[in-house]
């Protein structure tokens, strides 16, 4: 069940975006679709399917929602007019800015698994299926071409988001490549010890996502970043082998 405040935000978003764009469907993916949503911590991942390119006014919709509700800062939305070609970059509002990005095979598989619609037909009715080959190729490419090179840079690893995403992405990739399944972030935390991840870093991620947020001292940020970077750099080749 979706939290009442989140449901109100999503309902308001659907109403507002339908007033300015030719909306065919509005879908949920990510933690909202897979049952791992954490209020105030998780993003609100949304796809809007439109029959024509979205007008500039959709950015105004997002900015107005942000002014009215702090939760709206977490609302990330891509606007899709082309559902078949996975290489197409779609207008997206996320992190309080407007840019273009593809809807990845992982997102497409999440949409299919959750099959959650806020308006219009479900993903199963409109979205072409993502094959395991497409999913595996993307997961391998993401580890090889993005995360492995990122381990050669030191500065990013002091940020919470880099520590969290690196380890969680790695664990989820390991399971996907081994079984074809997509798992939640909560499940990924349980996988990490078996991959040799530092226990202190796993506990840190778990506390910040699911428990009382701990105070983070500068020395720990440095130590945590070193541990996360070192683990990621050695674990990726093993997962890809």
State the predicted function of each range:
Residues 1-5, 59-160, 167, 173:
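Conserved NTP/Mg2+-binding pocket subregion across the NTase superfamily
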Residues 1-27, 56-58, 241:
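Helical scaffold of the NTase/Pol beta-like nucleotidyltransferase catalytic core
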Residues 19-22, 40, 71:
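Short, structurally constrained coil/turn elements
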Residues 28-65, 74-81:
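Catalytic metal-binding acidic patch
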Residues 35-38, 85-90, 213:
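Short, solvent-exposed polar/charged micro-motifs at secondary-structure junctions
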Residues 125-241:
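Nucleotidyltransferase catalytic cores
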């Amino acid at each position: 069940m979706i939290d009442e405040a989140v449901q109100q935000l999503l309902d308001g978003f659907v109403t507002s975006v339908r007033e300015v764009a030719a909306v065919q469907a509005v879908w949920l993916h990510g933690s909202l679709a897979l049952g791992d949503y954490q209020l105030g911590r998780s993003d609100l991942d949304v796809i809007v399917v439109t029959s024509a390119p979205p007008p500039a006014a959709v950015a105004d919709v997002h900015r107005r929602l942000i002014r009215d509700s702090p939760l709206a800062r977490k609302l990330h939305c891509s606007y899709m007019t082309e559902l078949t070609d996975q290489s197409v970059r779609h207008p997206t509002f996320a992190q309080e800015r407007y840019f273009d990005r593809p809807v990845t095979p992982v997102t497409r598989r999440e949409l299919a698994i959750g099959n959650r619609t806020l308006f219009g037909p479900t993903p199963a009715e409109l979205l072409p299926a993502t094959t395991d080959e497409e999913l595996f190729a993307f997961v391998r490419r993401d580890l090889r071409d993005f995360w492995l090179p990122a381990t050669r840079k030191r500065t990013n690893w002091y940020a919470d988001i880099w520590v969290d995403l690196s380890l969680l992405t790695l664990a989820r990739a390991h399971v996907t490549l081994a079984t074809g399944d997509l798992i939640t972030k909560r499940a990924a935390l349980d996988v990490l010890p078996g991959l040799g991840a530092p226990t202190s870093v796993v506990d840190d991620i778990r506390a910040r996502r699911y428990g009382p947020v701990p105070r983070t001292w500068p020395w720990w940020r440095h130590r945590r970043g070193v541990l996360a970077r070192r683990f990621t750099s050695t674990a990726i080749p093993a997962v890809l082998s």
